[in-house]
Structures are given as structure tokens and as C-alpha cells.
Amino acid sequence: MIKLQKYSYLSHKYLILDTIEDCFSKKDLNFMHIPREEIGYIEFIRKDKIIIITYLHIYTSYRHKHYGYQVIDYLFSHYKFKCIVGETLKESRGFWNKCIRKYNGMRRNIYYSDNYTSLFVIPRQEISYKQIWDLLDYSYNIIY
């Protein structure tokens, strides 16, 4: 089970922590002082009930263990929003294509930065290109 912990000085950056709370009670965990493993980080902003993911990074030693899907599931279960919007890096196209299929999303052929190939919307929502462009512009102005 994973948890997101807010990074100390950035309001849009969260550490992804792996916990073992399924096996033990919180009282036992506090007694044992078992540290949570940091498996990566995610940067996202919420605006108008839409989550804009700017970066999701899982450390290489934790890849291929389905932590990316757990992060998306965590966002769905802990935040109230209509959809997730984000751009796709060339290296992570396979992961986001699987997420698009799994969560009934869609891909749009628009990108704000040269490093990215396209954009995704999970789950499928009717969003205009202008609204997507405004969301990406908003996120880049705040984060970068």
C-alpha cells in the first residue's frame, strides 16, 4: 500500500512512500519504528476539479512492480476530481498507454513542451483543446 507525503517546501510535489500497514496495526507500526520506503515522487496540481500531473517518477529499483498503477489508484480514491490530465514522455509511453486502457482514458495530439509526445485524459472527458492548453500553461507557470 502506498501513501503520498507532501514534500517539505513545494506544495505541488509529493513523495511516494511504500507502507506495510496492511500487515500491522498503526499502534504496532509506531512501536516497531519501521521506516517507510521512498519509491519515487509525483508532481501535480489541482485546478477546477482536474488534476494536472506534471511528473511521475518511480525509482529504477522499484519499477515493474505496479507502483505507477497504485499511485493512480491512490489519486482516484483520495481526491475528488473529474479527470487527470498529463503529458507523456517518450520513455513512459508504454505505462501511460496501459493506464489509458485500464482507466478508460483517451489520448490527445497536443503537447506544451518539446520533451513530450502527446497528452492523456483519464477517464475520458470532453475537454476542449483551449481548456487543455490553459491547464498546461497554468501548471507550467506554477511549477517551472
Q: Positions of the model-derived regions?
A:
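Conserved N-terminal entry element of GNAT/NAT acetyltransferase domains
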Residues: 1-15, 138-144
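Short secondary-structure junctions
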Residues: 3-6, 101-111
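Glycine-rich phosphate/pyrophosphate-binding loop shared by adenosine-nucleotide-utilizing enzymes
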Residues: 36-41, 51
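Conserved acetyl-CoA binding element of GNAT-fold acetyltransferases
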Residues: 49-60
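Conserved acetyl-CoA-binding loop-helix of GNAT-fold acetyltransferases
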Residues: 58, 64-77
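Conserved GNAT acetyl-CoA-binding A-motif
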Residues: 77-90
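Conserved active-site tyrosine of GNAT-family acetyltransferases
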Residues: 96, 100
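C-terminal "cap" of GNAT-fold acetyltransferases
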Residues: 109-144
